[in-house]
A protein has these predicted regions:
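Helix-boundary and N-terminal cytosolic regulatory elements
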Residues: 1-121, 151, 187, 191-204
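A short, structure-level motif marking secondary-structure boundaries and short turns
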Residues: 17-19, 129, 166-167
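A short, ordered amphipathic alpha-helix with a cationic face
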Residues: 22-23, 120, 143-146, 181-182
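Conserved residues at beta->alpha junctions
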Residues: 26-27, 103, 135, 172-175
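Membrane-associated alpha-helical segments
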Residues: 96, 137, 153-156, 160-238
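Short, charge-rich amphipathic alpha-helices with coiled-coil/heptad character
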Residues: 118-128, 156-162
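Well-ordered alpha/beta subsegment
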Residues: 124-152
Length: 238
C-alpha cells in the first residue's frame, strides 16, 4: 500500500504523486513495485535490500539515488517468540523523489504522520524527513522499553513467589529483545554521522535537529543498558 504525502504544516495525504512529495510504501504489493520501478525508476536492488529482515542501518548509492536504511521497533504478534523486534525501513531519495519502504506494519509511521499534523511540523527536505524518522524511532524504542520494564517487574514478582521455567524463559526473551534494541539504536546513531557527511555541503543540514536526534537516541541507548543490567542481575539471582 502506498500513500502520497505533502507537507503543509504537517503531512497531508493527496490523491496523486508530484515531485518532492513523500511516497510512503508499507507492505508493498505488485502494483507498488511497478509504480516504484517503472514510474519512478527506483533501483530494484534497493527494494530487495530493504526486504532483507536482517539488513543493518547503512547508506548506499546508485547513480543519483541515495538509499538510507534504518531499523525501527515494532510490537510482535502473540504468536511470535519475542514480544518486540526491529525491522528495516528504507528511505530512497534523489533530487525530486522521496520514497520510504517498509515491509512490515508498525505503529511508528502512522504515529509520525499524525504527529506532524498535530504539531504543524514543517519538514523542509529529504534529510529533515530522515532525521525526524530517526528521532521517532528513538521515541518508540523508549515507549516499548517502558512496557518491557513492566514485564520485567511482573516476572520478578512471579519468581519471588515460585521459580518457574516459564518466568525464566520470559526474562530470557526480554533480554534477547534488549540486545536487538541495543544494536538497532547504535546502528541508527552511526547513520547520523554518515548523513552529516553526505549532506555537509548542502543547505539541508539542520544542526539543531541533529542535536535533538542524538540526545533522544542516547536516552534510548542508556535506557536499554539500564534495563539490561537490571535483567542480568535478576536472572543471576535466580
Amino acid at each position: 500500500m502506498r500513500t502520497y504525502l505533502y507537507c503543509e504544516a504537517g503531512f497531508v495525504e493527496k490523491a496523486q504523486w508530484l515531485p518532492n512529495s513523500w511516497v510512503n510504501v508499507v507492505c508493498p504489493n505488485n502494483d507498488d513495485f511497478e509504480f516504484l520501478t517503472q514510474t519512478l525508476n527506483v533501483p530494484e536492488s534497493f527494494l530487495n535490500d530493504i526486504a532483507d529482515t536482517d539488513e543493518r542501518p547503512r547508506t548506499d548509492t546508485e547513480g543519483n539515488w541515495l538509499l538510507t536504511i534504518l531499523r525501527i521497533p515494532m510490537q510482535n504478534g502473540q504468536n511470535e517468540s519475542l514480544p518486540f523486534g526491529t525491522v528495516p525501513i528504507g528511505i530512497i531519495t534523489n533530487n525530486e523523489i522521496i520514497v520510504s519502504v517498509c515491509y512490515h506494519n508498525t505503529d511508528l509511521l502512522p504515529d509520525f504522520i499524525e504527529h506532524t499534523r498535530r504539531k504543524g511540523i514543517e519538514v523542509r527536505n529529504k534529510l529533515d524527513l530522515i532525521l525526524r524518522l530517526i528521532y521517532s524511532s528513538a521515541v518508540w524504542f523508549l515507549k516499548y522499553l517502558k512496557q518491557i520494564n513492566l514485564d520485567i517487574s511482573a516476572a520478578e514478582k512471579e519468581l519471588e513467589r515460585s521459580i518457574r521455567n516459564e518466568d525464566l524463559l520470559r526474562l530470557m526473551r526480554l533480554q534477547k529483545t534488549l540486545v536487538y534494541f541495543n544494536t538497532s539504536i547504535r546502528g541508527n546513531e552511526v547513520m547520523i554521522g554518515k548523513l552529516q557527511s553526505i549532506f555537509q555541503d548542502t543547505d539541508f543540514l539542520d544542526k539543531e535537529l541533529v542535536e535533538d536526534v542524538i540526545i533522544e537516541l542516547k536516552q534510548a541507548f542508556n535506557t536499554v543498558n539500564i534495563y539490561s543490567d537490571i535483567l542480568t542481575g535478576t536472572m543471576d539471582a535466580f
